[in-house]
């Protein structure tokens, strides 16, 4: 289990700090299959997972939904035939928080 995946999310309020540039550089190395995207001025983590068919993609999406409910932190999930695009960001701070990196690592573990 990766160091990030073993952590729990903390409650993220609107005044919580976004990750600094130094933290971003350190944390993104821990989840190398993820990329940073900026949409509408909001920094987000994104990864595309590939599957053999829609049924497997949907099963992964459902597992991710369960994980999100357990951690009370919810991603953008776009499910299509053979592919699931997952996007993590903290809505309350309109950017990236340590929680997003924790959840990205936990999302990767769903493949195991």
From Swiss-Prot:
GO terms for molecular function: 4-alpha-hydroxytetrahydrobiopterin dehydratase activity. It holds the Pfam family Pterin_4a. CDD domains: PCD_DCoH_subfamily_a. Its EC number is 4.2.1.96. GO terms for biological process: tetrahydrobiopterin biosynthetic process. Gene3D superfamilies: Transcriptional coactivator/pterin dehydratase. It catalyses: (4aS,6R)-4a-hydroxy-L-erythro-5,6,7,8-tetrahydrobiopterin = (6R)-L-erythro-6,7-dihydrobiopterin + H2O. It is an enzyme of class 4 (lyase). Keywords: Lyase. It comes from the Bacteria. Belongs to the pterin-4-alpha-carbinolamine dehydratase family. NCBIfam families: PRK00823.1-1. PANTHER family: PTERIN-4-ALPHA-CARBINOLAMINE DEHYDRATASE-RELATED. This is Putative pterin-4-alpha-carbinolamine dehydratase. It comes from Shewanella amazonensis (strain ATCC BAA-1098 / SB2B).
């Amino acid at each position: 289990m990766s160091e990030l995946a073993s952590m729990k999310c903390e409650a993220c309020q609107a005044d919580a700090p976004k990750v600094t540039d130094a933290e971003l550089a350190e944390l993104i190395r821990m989840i190398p299959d993820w990329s940073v995207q900026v949409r509408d001025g909001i920094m987000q983590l994104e990864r595309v997972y590939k599957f053999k068919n829609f049924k497997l993609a949907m099963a992964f999406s459902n597992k991710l939904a369960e994980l999100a409910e357990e951690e009370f932190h919810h991603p953008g999930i776009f499910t299509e035939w053979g592919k699931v695009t997952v996007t993590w960001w903290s809505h309350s701070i309109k950017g990236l928080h340590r929680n997003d990196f924790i959840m990205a690592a936990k999302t990767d573990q769903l493949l195991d």
